[in-house]
């Protein structure tokens, strides 16, 4: 069965030749994995910002999804390792993986996500997942501090005539540098992109997490990602209540500093 590439994913060709090359290879790659793993297509192709997601049935007729991720996305390189480490505890279950081809076979979840809930209720759900996700980091993972160091270098190169007060740039740079050298900034495996759209309803548990951008970091940064991604602007009271909800459920924080947001959205 020919694999169709959703137009919105195919539009990523505009990001350069690496993207275009991967998209050219993608239909054949998908067809090869489907055949080799004995899968049967079972619905319309879906996509995230950097992945193709195909609903399939396994050889045992179990519903699943085949996820094929852009091979130039370093943030998702160790997604399979992280899912294997979590072992389905609070997260989508990994059924099979081919890291070389960035192919993951995952249990199929529902399409409803936390965006359908009241903000505080959604943050309570996410907060309840923190203690299950925040485990000792795998040695293969990139560190959050490596990303922050790179972002800080970019910030320092900002021209002095940029439309932002220089003192704010200098303050942000100083805070980032202190974050990078703090030992508490690494050592815990964090999801890296834990927001409403990355928590889907399921049968095995009420809610399960998808699409990690795993890294070794500080678990307190997860709260910033959750409370900073709500889809629409929140009233101050709602934002504060949500932050309180996620904090009460999270693992004991290593610090109370303000940390940078991490990652970017990518469904599934």
Describe the predicted segments one by one.
Residues 201-247, 251-254:
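Active-site Asp-x-Gly
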Residues 22-32, 138-192, 202-203, 251:
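An alpha-helical support segment within catalytic cores of ATP-dependent transferases
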């Amino acid at each position: 069965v020919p694999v169709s590439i959703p137009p919105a994913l195919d539009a990523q060709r505009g990001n350069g030749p690496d993207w275009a090359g991967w998209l050219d290879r993608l239909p054949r790659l998908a067809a090869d994995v489907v055949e080799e793993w004995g899968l049967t297509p079972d619905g319309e192709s879906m996509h995230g910002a950097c992945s193709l997601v195909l609903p399939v049935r396994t050889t045992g007729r179990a519903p699943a999804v085949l996820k094929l991720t852009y091979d130039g996305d370093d943030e998702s390189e160790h997604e399979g390792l992280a899912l294997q480490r979590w072992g389905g505890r609070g997260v989508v279950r990994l059924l099979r993986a081919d890291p070389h081809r960035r192919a993951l076979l995952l249990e199929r979840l529902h399409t409803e996500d936390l965006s359908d809930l009241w903000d505080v209720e959604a943050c309570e759900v996410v907060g309840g997942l923190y203690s299950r996700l925040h485990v000792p980091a795998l040695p293969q993972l990139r560190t959050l501090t490596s990303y922050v160091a790179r972002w800080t270098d970019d910030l320092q190169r900002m021209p002095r005539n940029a439309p932002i007060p220089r003192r704010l740039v200098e303050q942000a740079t100083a805070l980032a540098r202190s974050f990078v050298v703090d030992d508490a900034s690494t050592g815990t495996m964090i999801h890296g992109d834990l927001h409403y759209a990355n928590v889907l309803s399921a049968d095995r548990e009420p809610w399960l997490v998808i699409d990690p951008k795993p890294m070794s970091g500080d678990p307190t940064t997860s709260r910033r990602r959750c409370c900073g991604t709500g889809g629409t602007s929140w009233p101050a009271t709602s934002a504060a209540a949500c932050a309180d909800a996620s904090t009460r459920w999270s693992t004991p924080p290593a610090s109370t500093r303000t940390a940078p947001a991490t990652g970017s959205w990518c469904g599934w």
